[in-house]
Amino acid sequence: MATQAYTELQAAPPPSQPPQAPPQAQPQPPPPPPPAAPQPPQPPTAAATPQPQYVTELQSPQPQAQPPGGQKQYVTELPAVPAPSQPTGAPTPSPAPQQYIVVTVSEGAMRASETVSEASPGSTASQTGVPTQVVQQVQGTQQRLLVQTSVQAKPGHVSPLQLTNIQVPQQALPTQRLVVQSAAPGSKGGQVSLTVHGTQQVHSPPEQSPVQANSSSSKTAGAPTGTVPQQLQVHGVQQSVPVTQERSVVQATPQAPKPGPVQPLTVQGLQPVHVAQEVQQLQQVPVPHVYSSQVQYVEGGDASYTASAIRSSTYSYPETPLYTQTASTSYYEAAGTATQVSTPATSQAVASSGSMPMYVSGSQVVASSTSTGAGASNSSGGGGSGGGGGGGGGGGGGGSGSTGGGGSGAGTYVIQGGYMLGSASQSYSHTTRASPATVQWLLDNYETAEGVSLPRSTLYCHYLLHCQEQKLEPVNAASFGKLIRSVFMGLRTRRLGTRGNSKYHYYGLRIKASSPLLRLMEDQQHMAMRGQPFSQKQRLKPIQKMEGMTNGVAVGQQPSTGLSDISAQVQQYQQFLDASRSLPDFTELDLQGKVLPEGVGPGDIKAFQVLYREHCEAIVDVMVNLQFTLVETLWKTFWRYNLSQPSEAPPLAVHDEAEKRLPKAILVLLSKFEPVLQWTKHCDNVLYQGLVEILIPDVLRPIPSALTQAIRNFAKSLESWLTHAMVNIPEEMLRVKVAAAGAFAQTLRRYTSLNHLAQAARAVLQNTAQINQMLSDLNRVDFANVQEQASWVCRCEDRVVQRLEQDFKVTLQQQNSLEQWAAWLDGVVSQVLKPYQGSAGFPKAAKLFLLKWSFYSSMVIRDLTLRSAASFGSFHLIRLLYDEYMYYLIEHRVAQAKGETPIAVMGEFANLATSLNPLDPDKDEEEEEEEESEDELPQDISLAAGGESPALGPETLEPPAKLARTDARGLFVQALPSS
């Protein structure tokens, strides 16, 4: 049985003595002291309290003597539980922790010179209904409470009572009561007002926290004479760590009523004794005249509170809060059975009614498809206030703890991530219904991985097909999205795609390699990007066995962290490849009349040629099978990587065989021989050009995004793989190999980007509304102004520009396909470069046309931008595609004119940082060709108006970079007269 504590009120000197009371008993002005300057606590001493008065028992108050002036005391007791009288000062047992508020207020005016004396006992206490809200306020060592009440005895006369700076030292008694007694003459219809507002409970350190409770007097309409209607209000009370109950008695005794102004009465420094810091539970007390929607009681000793503060009595909140906060406690389920998987889960209570289920988060899948009854709800956490714990089918509202109060769990699933999936008989607006078959279907066909994404619409289409096969009723897309996020945790949503054609994707989700949905994706050409970011530390090993290699994934490596290996789906992707293409024959190695290095014989040269041919054929084989990761292994095998690493495993049999055919020492000597370097460069160009045509036979043909991403990841890894494999190989050979590999990687990146642009532009060109908008915006472009600005730089003929403009508009109006647009661009290139066909100036003219095309198209886009064209995004996409495809056409035309492969043409300028060759090996030859073709350039019908400006020489056709090396001012100085 918890004992009750009493609070002693320090008595003031009688009125006959001089006003020498302590500071806390002296009258002070009504304004409360600032919270920043709390008064220090005054310990109770005998000198300060010559006549102490103890409140013995408030449950059953005893008669007291009438105070002077006909004063009456009204004792307001919240619990209203009578108890037998006890001796003065003795602790009173209490059956349950309770809390009292007793206010003693005297009416009438006091003089400033008079002091406060204690009230004489004898007044009869009466219980009145006071609307209140229980507030708990305790700090570690000290506590200050400021209560202001005002009693209006007559109209115009108010006697406020202020109680400030209650210091509660840390002592030991189990209970705490706050008693406020209010006394008023029965002959007057005075009104006492005490209001409770905004009670909050917070955790605070053991220091003084000012708490103010301001009350305002109010009149009650229609109050009968002789009654004292009271309204209790407490403003801004902060409640800290709960302790035991405490009783505080405040009594104010009036003097004889005298005419004069009303003086405020202030009592400070009330120090209760015998207080212990213990956990206290506040009992919900039924209070008359208080509505349940306006009063909220806090139960329990923990420091957890509702989502909102305690309701104010001046504003009605008819609804209960939706969420209640519970302690962050992890609940562990019982041992799972064959139909129930149990993992640690953190439950969050949700205030609900009926059989509303509670949310469960953190567990993978907690399911019970057969359990029913009260024990079927053991998968959720404790049920909060207002609802029981939910389970497989949602427990009843009466249960609390780890099980619901009943309910059925048949045919239901509990999914991780905070979603309760009910059975078909239930219908919840905020939950998602899914059958176990659907959840299992998701787990069987999809998996999470880094760096991949899957279109959201595609996933929903797969779900609709699944529901059709299983004869299930599908949910809408939004509910299905919640299910996806519940089954696969950590998914993010990204909007991927080009401007105007982007779609939402689930980032971090892909289709499993064993799923039959891959064939469906192939038909729809909506492949998930199964490519993964490259990590040199951990890479996947190939699927199929190669000579000297092993199958599968190496021990200790994780497939989800390495470079993607799509060789498992080679049958699905080979239709997009040109696997029938074989490696062309290599030319014979020409020694150029040079002497072989010392120690190298003709047989070694022949062995090198045979081994390198076999090496290149092996690379073609693994590329056709999409085993990209094997390329690094083949490089390491040929260049004897393991032989140069003493810490590596013993050399394999394939290394021993290669070592017998061509020792590494001879290989190193040949890597410095110039004829071998030139032959290797030529072979690499042929090899890489063949690989490009195998992987991307048609840049405009749709390619699955998974294959595209795998190719791009492979291109990103090429140079680092090659550099790592050619350790201890002479620098001369390394430069040749890296230059060719760099050109190969750049070509793969450009072609995959071109293919991506082509697919995006294909959707735009097939959209009639977008085509009409583009045509309308293009007709508003001032091409005369564009030609005037561009002609100074491009020097294009007006008739040629007008013809291109008209052809572009006609092709756009006819809504031609992407292939028809490509044919039109190819015709433009052929027409422009026709005068240079077969001449030495063809490469230079082709490059110059590419610069002029790009500059002119940028001027058109600039005009559309300034006009804020609605179809600017579509034009920007089309412009990017046409520029890239024009680059592709020029590249192949120049390579054809030079009799080389496009890889060889691009390799001339590759690896600029490490190459020791000049920037342009053919620079001197091209400068001679420029002089020879001086009379040919003005004859171009589309690039220049032949002979219109004699002042402009042929040097203006040079790219700006080369002009800067000769005469940077020539173009501008000579062009001024004609501008």
Curated annotation (Swiss-Prot):
Record's compositionally biased regions (Pro residues): 12-44, 81-96
Region entry Necessary for dimerization, spans: 744-979
Assigned keywords, A-Z: Activator, DNA-binding, Nucleus, Phosphoprotein, Transcription, Transcription regulation
Source species, domain of life: Eukaryota
One GO term of the biological process aspect: regulation of transcription by RNA polymerase II
Low complexity biased stretches: 45-73, 127-136, 370-379
GO cellular component: chromatin; intracellular membrane-bounded organelle; nucleoplasm
Renumbered residue ranges of the record's region Disordered: 1-136, 181-227, 370-405, 915-960
Record's compositionally biased regions (Acidic residues): 922-938
GO molecular function, one term: RNA polymerase II cis-regulatory region sequence-specific DNA binding
Modified residues (Phosphoserine): 60, 978-979
DNA-binding region: 438-513
DNA-binding in keyword set: yes
Claim: Phosphoprotein is one of the keywords in the record: yes
Annotated Gly residues bias: 380-405
InterPro entries reported in the protein's UniProt record: DNA-bd_RFX (IPR003150), RFX-like (IPR039779), RFX1_trans_act (IPR007668), WH-like_DNA-bd_sf (IPR036388), WH_DNA-bd_sf (IPR036390)
Compositionally biased intervals (Polar residues): 114-126, 190-203, 209-220
Family membership: Belongs to the RFX family.
Quaternary context: Homodimer; binds DNA as a homodimer. Heterodimer; heterodimerizes with RFX2 and RFX3.
Main function: Regulatory factor essential for MHC class II genes expression. Binds to the X boxes of MHC class II genes. Also binds to an inverted repeat (ENH1) required for hepatitis B virus genes expression and to the most upstream element (alpha) of the RPL30 promoter.
Designated name of the protein: MHC class II regulatory factor RFX1
Organism: Homo sapiens
Lineage: Eukaryota, Metazoa, Chordata, Craniata, Vertebrata
Encoding gene, per UniProt annotation: RFX1
